[in-house]
Amino acid sequence: MLLQIDRVLTTEELNQLNTLLQAGVFEDGKWTAGIYAKTVKDNQQLVQEGEEYRVASEIVLSALSRNQLFQAYVQPKIIGPLLFSRYEVGMAYGTHTDNALMGSGDQLRRSDVSLTIFLNDPFAYEGGALVLDTSLGEQYFKLPAGSMIVYPSIFLHRVETVSKGVRLVAVAWVQSLIRDPLERELLFELDTVRRSLFEKQGKTVDFDLLCKVYSNLLRKWAEI
Protein backbone atom coordinates (compact mmCIF):
# COMPACT_ATOMS: atom_id res chain seq x y z
CA MET A 1 0.00 0.00 0.00
CA LEU A 2 1.24 3.45 -0.94
CA LEU A 3 0.18 6.44 1.12
CA GLN A 4 0.40 10.12 0.24
CA ILE A 5 0.30 12.47 3.22
CA ASP A 6 -0.08 16.18 2.52
CA ARG A 7 1.14 19.10 4.66
CA VAL A 8 3.50 17.03 6.78
CA LEU A 9 5.66 20.14 7.15
CA THR A 10 4.35 23.61 7.92
CA THR A 11 5.27 26.65 5.83
CA GLU A 12 7.54 27.83 8.64
CA GLU A 13 9.31 24.47 8.79
CA LEU A 14 9.77 24.43 5.01
CA ASN A 15 11.30 27.90 5.13
CA GLN A 16 13.64 26.82 7.94
CA LEU A 17 14.69 23.71 6.04
CA ASN A 18 15.38 25.59 2.83
CA THR A 19 17.47 28.14 4.73
CA LEU A 20 19.45 25.31 6.33
CA LEU A 21 19.97 23.57 2.99
CA GLN A 22 21.17 26.78 1.37
CA ALA A 23 23.71 27.26 4.16
CA GLY A 24 24.81 23.63 4.39
CA VAL A 25 27.58 21.75 2.61
CA PHE A 26 26.63 19.01 0.15
CA GLU A 27 28.66 16.02 -0.98
CA ASP A 28 28.39 13.24 -3.55
CA GLY A 29 25.38 11.08 -2.69
CA LYS A 30 27.02 7.85 -3.85
CA TRP A 31 28.64 7.16 -0.48
CA THR A 32 25.29 6.32 1.17
CA ALA A 33 24.17 3.95 -1.61
CA GLY A 34 24.64 0.19 -1.72
CA ILE A 35 27.35 -1.41 -3.82
CA TYR A 36 25.08 -1.78 -6.85
CA ALA A 37 22.83 1.26 -6.38
CA LYS A 38 25.80 3.64 -6.32
CA THR A 39 26.45 2.81 -9.99
CA VAL A 40 23.17 4.56 -10.93
CA LYS A 41 23.04 7.25 -8.23
CA ASP A 42 23.85 10.82 -9.20
CA ASN A 43 22.81 13.40 -6.63
CA GLN A 44 24.16 15.45 -3.74
CA GLN A 45 23.45 15.06 -0.03
CA LEU A 46 23.76 17.36 2.95
CA VAL A 47 26.80 16.30 4.99
CA GLN A 48 25.71 14.62 8.21
CA GLU A 49 28.44 16.10 10.41
CA GLY A 50 27.24 19.70 10.17
CA GLU A 51 24.92 21.71 12.42
CA GLU A 52 22.56 22.22 9.48
CA TYR A 53 21.98 18.47 9.23
CA ARG A 54 21.30 18.15 12.96
CA VAL A 55 18.72 20.93 13.03
CA ALA A 56 17.09 19.83 9.76
CA SER A 57 16.78 16.27 11.08
CA GLU A 58 15.14 17.50 14.28
CA ILE A 59 12.55 19.43 12.26
CA VAL A 60 11.65 16.45 10.09
CA LEU A 61 11.61 13.91 12.93
CA SER A 62 9.38 16.21 14.98
CA ALA A 63 6.97 16.51 12.05
CA LEU A 64 6.83 12.73 11.63
CA SER A 65 6.27 12.12 15.34
CA ARG A 66 3.23 14.42 15.46
CA ASN A 67 1.63 13.14 12.26
CA GLN A 68 -1.05 10.69 13.37
CA LEU A 69 -1.63 9.29 9.88
CA PHE A 70 2.06 8.44 9.49
CA GLN A 71 2.21 6.87 12.94
CA ALA A 72 -0.91 4.76 12.33
CA TYR A 73 0.21 3.56 8.90
CA VAL A 74 3.90 2.93 9.55
CA GLN A 75 3.96 1.87 13.23
CA PRO A 76 7.57 3.13 13.44
CA LYS A 77 10.10 1.54 15.75
CA ILE A 78 13.25 3.18 14.37
CA ILE A 79 13.33 6.09 11.91
CA GLY A 80 16.56 6.70 10.10
CA PRO A 81 18.87 7.41 8.57
CA LEU A 82 17.60 10.75 7.27
CA LEU A 83 19.10 12.08 4.06
CA PHE A 84 18.60 15.51 2.53
CA SER A 85 19.13 15.17 -1.21
CA ARG A 86 19.64 17.75 -3.94
CA TYR A 87 19.30 17.02 -7.65
CA GLU A 88 20.62 19.64 -10.05
CA VAL A 89 20.23 19.67 -13.83
CA GLY A 90 21.32 16.36 -15.35
CA MET A 91 21.17 14.43 -12.08
CA ALA A 92 19.06 11.30 -11.55
CA TYR A 93 18.89 8.07 -9.58
CA GLY A 94 18.47 5.01 -11.77
CA THR A 95 16.38 1.95 -11.01
CA HIS A 96 17.37 0.32 -7.72
CA THR A 97 16.07 -1.33 -4.59
CA ASP A 98 16.79 -0.09 -1.08
CA ASN A 99 19.11 -2.12 1.13
CA ALA A 100 17.15 -4.55 3.31
CA LEU A 101 19.48 -3.88 6.25
CA MET A 102 21.06 -0.54 7.06
CA GLY A 103 23.67 0.53 9.58
CA SER A 104 25.96 -1.84 11.47
CA GLY A 105 26.57 -3.23 14.93
CA ASP A 106 24.14 -1.86 17.51
CA GLN A 107 22.75 0.47 14.83
CA LEU A 108 21.79 -2.33 12.44
CA ARG A 109 18.15 -2.00 11.40
CA ARG A 110 15.73 -3.36 8.84
CA SER A 111 14.22 -1.14 6.15
CA ASP A 112 10.49 -1.91 6.12
CA VAL A 113 9.11 1.42 4.93
CA SER A 114 10.60 4.15 2.73
CA LEU A 115 9.51 7.78 2.62
CA THR A 116 10.21 10.85 0.54
CA ILE A 117 9.24 14.35 1.70
CA PHE A 118 9.28 16.97 -1.04
CA LEU A 119 10.94 20.21 0.09
CA ASN A 120 10.22 22.41 -2.92
CA ASP A 121 7.23 22.69 -5.24
CA PRO A 122 6.94 20.82 -8.56
CA PHE A 123 7.13 24.05 -10.59
CA ALA A 124 10.63 24.70 -9.18
CA TYR A 125 12.09 21.99 -11.41
CA GLU A 126 11.35 19.87 -14.47
CA GLY A 127 11.75 16.10 -14.46
CA GLY A 128 12.78 14.59 -11.14
CA ALA A 129 9.67 12.48 -10.52
CA LEU A 130 9.91 9.56 -8.11
CA VAL A 131 8.83 6.46 -10.03
CA LEU A 132 7.77 3.28 -8.21
CA ASP A 133 7.56 0.00 -10.12
CA THR A 134 4.46 -1.60 -8.56
CA SER A 135 2.20 -4.50 -9.49
CA LEU A 136 -0.12 -1.94 -11.11
CA GLY A 137 2.69 -0.56 -13.25
CA GLU A 138 4.85 2.51 -12.81
CA GLN A 139 3.52 5.15 -10.41
CA TYR A 140 4.86 8.71 -10.66
CA PHE A 141 5.12 11.13 -7.74
CA LYS A 142 6.04 14.79 -7.82
CA LEU A 143 4.26 16.35 -4.87
CA PRO A 144 3.85 19.85 -3.42
CA ALA A 145 6.40 21.08 -0.91
CA GLY A 146 5.74 19.58 2.51
CA SER A 147 3.93 16.51 1.16
CA MET A 148 5.20 12.97 1.57
CA ILE A 149 4.91 9.60 -0.15
CA VAL A 150 5.27 6.52 2.08
CA TYR A 151 5.62 3.00 0.71
CA PRO A 152 6.92 -0.48 1.60
CA SER A 153 10.65 -0.74 0.86
CA ILE A 154 10.08 -3.72 -1.44
CA PHE A 155 9.68 -1.84 -4.73
CA LEU A 156 12.16 -1.10 -7.46
CA HIS A 157 12.15 2.65 -7.96
CA ARG A 158 14.03 5.52 -9.57
CA VAL A 159 14.22 9.31 -9.78
CA GLU A 160 13.94 10.74 -13.27
CA THR A 161 16.58 13.11 -14.61
CA VAL A 162 16.13 16.75 -13.60
CA SER A 163 16.11 18.84 -16.78
CA LYS A 164 15.59 22.27 -15.23
CA GLY A 165 15.86 23.77 -11.75
CA VAL A 166 16.74 21.95 -8.52
CA ARG A 167 14.89 19.12 -6.76
CA LEU A 168 15.10 19.05 -2.95
CA VAL A 169 13.82 16.15 -0.84
CA ALA A 170 14.24 14.48 2.52
CA VAL A 171 14.27 10.69 2.44
CA ALA A 172 14.31 8.12 5.23
CA TRP A 173 13.77 4.46 6.00
CA VAL A 174 11.81 3.03 8.89
CA GLN A 175 11.98 -0.22 10.79
CA SER A 176 8.36 -0.86 11.69
CA LEU A 177 6.97 -2.67 14.69
CA ILE A 178 5.08 -4.69 12.07
CA ARG A 179 7.48 -6.39 9.67
CA ASP A 180 4.92 -7.72 7.16
CA PRO A 181 3.39 -5.08 4.84
CA LEU A 182 0.03 -6.88 4.60
CA GLU A 183 -0.27 -7.11 8.38
CA ARG A 184 0.69 -3.44 8.63
CA GLU A 185 -2.00 -2.51 6.10
CA LEU A 186 -4.67 -4.56 7.90
CA LEU A 187 -3.88 -2.83 11.19
CA PHE A 188 -4.02 0.57 9.51
CA GLU A 189 -7.42 -0.17 8.00
CA LEU A 190 -8.77 -1.48 11.31
CA ASP A 191 -7.52 1.65 13.06
CA THR A 192 -9.14 3.83 10.39
CA VAL A 193 -12.49 2.08 10.85
CA ARG A 194 -12.44 2.28 14.65
CA ARG A 195 -11.56 5.99 14.60
CA SER A 196 -14.41 6.65 12.17
CA LEU A 197 -16.83 4.61 14.28
CA PHE A 198 -15.85 6.48 17.44
CA GLU A 199 -16.32 9.87 15.75
CA LYS A 200 -19.81 8.91 14.54
CA GLN A 201 -21.16 6.85 17.44
CA GLY A 202 -18.84 7.27 20.40
CA LYS A 203 -17.69 4.41 22.61
CA THR A 204 -20.11 1.64 21.67
CA VAL A 205 -20.01 -2.14 22.05
CA ASP A 206 -18.95 -2.42 18.41
CA PHE A 207 -16.16 0.08 18.97
CA ASP A 208 -14.90 -1.86 21.98
CA LEU A 209 -14.89 -5.08 19.96
CA LEU A 210 -12.87 -3.43 17.19
CA CYS A 211 -10.40 -2.15 19.77
CA LYS A 212 -10.06 -5.65 21.15
CA VAL A 213 -9.39 -7.12 17.69
CA TYR A 214 -6.89 -4.37 16.87
CA SER A 215 -5.02 -4.74 20.16
CA ASN A 216 -4.83 -8.51 19.94
CA LEU A 217 -3.55 -8.44 16.35
CA LEU A 218 -0.99 -5.80 17.31
CA ARG A 219 0.07 -7.98 20.24
CA LYS A 220 0.38 -10.99 17.91
CA TRP A 221 2.36 -9.27 15.15
CA ALA A 222 4.45 -6.58 16.82
CA GLU A 223 8.21 -7.12 17.11
CA ILE A 224 9.57 -5.21 20.08
Curated annotation (Swiss-Prot):
2-oxoglutarate binds at residue 167. Keywords: Dioxygenase, Iron, Metal-binding, Oxidoreductase, Vitamin C. Residues 77-176 form the Fe2OG dioxygenase domain. This is PKHD-type hydroxylase tll1907. It is an enzyme of class 1 (oxidoreductase). Fe cation binds at residues 96, 98, 157. GO terms for biological process: DNA damage response; intracellular iron ion homeostasis. Its EC number is 1.14.11.-. Binds 1 Fe(2+) ion per subunit. One of its GO terms (molecular function) is L-ascorbic acid binding. InterPro entries: Oxoglu/Fe-dep_dioxygenase_dom, PKHD_C, PKHD_hydroxylase, Pro_4_hyd_alph, Pro_4_hyd_alph_FE2OG_OXY. Its cofactor is Fe(2+); L-ascorbate. Pfam families: 2OG-FeII_Oxy_3, PKHD_C.
